[in-house]
C-alpha cells in the first residue's frame, strides 16, 4: 500500500504509457491524473473474474459454513417466534440476539455487513440501520425483515428472512408469495453458455410485474470467500452483461417494499455448477405468509424439497424443543 501523497507522486511520474485501468474500481482523481500523460484502456480488472470463480475447496467450505450459519439463524427464528408475544423484543435486541447465536461457533469472526433488522415500516427501508432513535418493538401483526450475515474463517454468509408476527394481511401474503415465486424462478433458472445476470433478474420480477409491482434493487450480487459480501463482476441486475460461469457465488434476493408499512425480502446464496444454481443457504422460509393457490406444482415441490433438506441438515444442531419447532417450520405446505 502507498501513502496517498506518495502514490500521487508515483503516478505523476508515469508518462507515455498504455495503461489498463478499471474505472469502476479506480477513483476519478487517479484516473484523471493518469489520463493527462498516458493512453488509458478502460477495461474490467481481470482479477475480478479470477476471484469470482470459486475453486472446489472454497465451494466445499461455503457449503459447510452455511449449515453452521443456518443453524444459528434458525435457532434465532425459533427463539423469536416463541418469545415475541411474551417479552419485549426490539430491533436492536433481536439483532444482538442473532449475533450471539452466531458467536457460539468458534469459527465466527464478525458480521459480514451491518445487520438490517427492521419491523413494520422500518422493513421498507432497503438499507435500514437501526439506531436508538428508530428502534421499534416487534409487535403482533407486524412482519419483521432481518438481513444478516457472518464472516467465518472459511466462508462468508448473507441471508434474509421475512417473518410473520401473526400478520393476517391478504395483500402482504399475495406480495410475499409473488416474491417467493421470483426467488424460486431464479433457483430454477437454466444457465446457458451466454446467460447473463440481466436475464435472471428479468425472470425474478415477472410475478410482481403481473400485478404492476416491482422492487428498486438488483436481484442478486456476487459474494466473496471470507472477503467482501458484495463482489463483482457478476450480479443479477438489469444492466449486468457478465456471463454466468460455473463456480460463481451470488445472492438471490427479490423483494417488495411498501413505504411506511412493511418490507419483504427472501434471500439465499447460491453457487453455479453444471449450469444450474444450487442453494448454499440452509434456513426455513416463512410458510405462514404463503398463498398456496397462486403457486404451481413445481414451486410447491421446490419449497417442500428445500425444507426437507433444511430439516435434515440442521436437526443435529437443535435441542429437543427446537427440533419440534424446526419440524413444524419445515413441514410440507
Feature locations, PLM:
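Active-site neighborhoods and metal-handling regions in enzymes and metal-associated proteins
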Residues: 1-333
Amino acid at each position: 500500500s502507498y501513502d496517498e501523497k506518495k502514490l500521487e507522486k508515483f503516478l505523476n511520474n508515469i508518462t507515455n504509457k498504455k495503461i489498463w485501468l478499471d474505472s469502476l474500481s479506480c477513483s476519478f482523481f487517479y484516473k484523471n491524473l493518469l489520463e493527462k500523460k498516458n493512453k488509458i484502456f478502460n477495461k474490467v480488472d481481470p482479477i475480478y473474474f479470477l476471484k469470482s470463480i470459486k475453486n472446489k475447496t472454497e465451494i466445499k467450505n461455503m457449503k459447510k459454513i452455511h449449515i453452521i450459519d443456518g443453524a444459528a439463524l434458525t435457532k434465532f427464528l425459533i427463539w423469536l417466534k416463541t418469545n415475541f408475544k411474551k417479552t419485549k423484543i426490539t430491533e436492536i435486541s433481536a439483532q444482538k440476539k442473532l449475533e450471539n447465536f452466531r458467536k457460539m461457533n468458534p469459527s465466527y469472526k464478525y458480521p459480514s455487513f451491518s445487520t438490517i433488522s427492521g419491523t413494520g415500516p422500518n422493513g421498507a427501508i432497503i438499507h435500514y440501520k437501526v439506531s436508538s432513535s428508530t428502534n421499534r418493538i416487534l409487535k403482533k401483526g407486524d412482519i419483521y425483515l432481518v438481513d444478516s450475515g457472518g464472516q467465518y474463517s472459511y466462508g462468508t454468509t448473507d441471508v434474509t428472512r421475512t417473518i410473520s408476527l401473526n400478520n393476517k394481511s391478504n395483500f402482504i401474503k399475495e406480495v410475499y408469495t409473488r416474491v417467493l415465486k421470483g426467488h424460486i424462478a431464479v433457483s430454477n433458472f437454466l444457465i446457458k453458455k451466454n446467460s447473463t445476470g440481466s436475464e435472471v433478474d428479468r425472470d425474478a420480477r415477472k410475478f410482481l410485474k403481473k400485478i404492476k409491482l416491482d422492487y428498486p434493487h438488483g436481484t442478486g450480487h456476487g459474494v466473496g470467500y471470507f472477503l467482501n459480501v458484495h463482489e463483482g463482476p457478476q450480479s443479477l441486475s438489469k444492466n449486468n452483461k457478465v456471463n454466468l460461469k460455473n463456480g460463481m457465488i451470488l445472492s438471490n434476493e427479490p423483494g417488495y417494499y411498501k413505504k411506511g408499512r412493511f418490507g419483504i425480502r427472501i434471500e439465499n446464496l447460491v453457487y453455479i455448477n453444471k449450469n444450474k444454481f444450487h442453494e448454499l443457504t440452509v434456513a426455513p422460509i416463512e410458510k405462514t405468509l404463503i398463498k398456496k393457490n397462486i403457486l404451481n406444482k413445481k414451486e410447491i415441490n421446490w419449497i417442500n424439497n428445500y425444507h426437507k433438506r433444511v430439516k435434515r441438515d440442521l436437526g443435529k444442531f437443535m435441542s429437543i424443543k427446537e427440533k419440534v419447532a424446526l419440524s413444524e417450520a419445515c413441514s410440507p405446505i
